[in-house]
């Protein structure tokens, strides 16, 4: 077993050297690396996804050297899908594929079981994973350029590659370092964790190398384990580290909610919500007049509506300023902060835009027998934390 673990580490250290971003290359890039027009265009598309990128120079070098980098994303099948998992994922994945990336979406069924999602029932978790794929298809994800991989199937088929890697990552890290990563599961270091949940970060770190990912495209809440993967590269003397591209996390719709909660229906828009449900949730959403910071309605517009439509339209009577179409978030924020744009008018425009985006998904789940059956099962499941 020791020999096998050593072989895995050696393979990781030497693989893809032809496209590796060495420290020398990264330095020369910052000292005057010139991207071609095509590479610069691809870079701008990919970089637009991330609230944070570690490291930008490495990303530029990667795109210059590799026509089809592998981008890794993943999810725990854990109940109904909210709009950030649905629409934002479609926006980001389609940007990656348009920039030439191969996207691998890791359906983390074993991870959901480790984290006790759906009560740890793998059959239910499987149903949820299939339901997620139906939503993305209906919402317009470029599935021809996306590879969906079930963690249980991939790990079982390549166990001799996967488990030595997990063990080596575990061996090279102290328990406090692993505990700092439990945020990736929606847990905190002070929670009473099972042994399975302590294993989870080591496995997710291993996924990155197992899938041969060049780019980790996950939310800011997954940042710590992605950084762990880069630190592991230092441990094994691997030059080409995975690039971290972390997207923004949408807040819940109620005041003070940093994240959406599947246990609080008013905190999030779900992908198959009916028009009336969307309207009620937005009407009740926190949206203080003239306040931009911490305003979830404005966040929805910035991260969902504008990327989807390239504009945001407010419909008003002439006496209140008439209809107005915005092309930039800065203009929306300025009008809102000044009081020119009223919360009621902003919410009305947001409702209209959200319902336009969600209508094809609703139609799919009403007309497609398989999708309809999956949703019926999902709604009957009890969501577990």
UniProtKB/Swiss-Prot annotation:
- GO cellular component terms given for this protein: cytosol
Which GO terms fall under molecular function for this chain's record?
Answer: ATP binding; tyrosine-tRNA ligase activity
Residues annotated for L-tyrosine binding in this entry: 200, 204, 207, 222
Compartments annotated for it: namely: Cytoplasm, Cytosol
Q: What is its EC number?
A: 6.1.1.1
- GO BP term, pick one: tRNA aminoacylation for protein translation
* Motif 'HIGH' region, chain ranges: 77-85
Keywords assigned by UniProt, alphabetized: Aminoacyl-tRNA synthetase, ATP-binding, Cytoplasm, Ligase, Nucleotide-binding, Protein biosynthesis
Q: Name one Pfam family in it.
A: tRNA-synt_1b
Task: Please list the reactions this protein catalyses.
Answer: tRNA(Tyr) + L-tyrosine + ATP = L-tyrosyl-tRNA(Tyr) + AMP + diphosphate + H(+)
Q: What happens when the gene is disrupted?
A: No visible phenotype under normal growth conditions.
Where is this chain primarily localised?
cytoplasm
Top EC class, one word = ligase
What top-level branch of life does the organism fall under? Answer: Eukaryota
Q: Where does ATP bind?
A: 262
Q: Does the keyword Transcription apply?
A: no
Locus of motif 'KMSKS' region: 259-263
Quote the InterPro entries the UniProt record gives.
aa-tRNA-synth_Ic, Rossmann-like_a/b/a_fold, Tyr-tRNA-ligase_arc/euk-type, Tyr-tRNA_synthase
State the function annotated in the UniProt record: Catalyzes the attachment of tyrosine to tRNA(Tyr) in a two-step reaction: tyrosine is first activated by ATP to form Tyr-AMP and then transferred to the acceptor end of tRNA(Tyr).
> Which family does the entry's similarity section mention?
Belongs to the class-I aminoacyl-tRNA synthetase family.
Q: What is this protein called?
A: Tyrosine--tRNA ligase 1, cytoplasmic
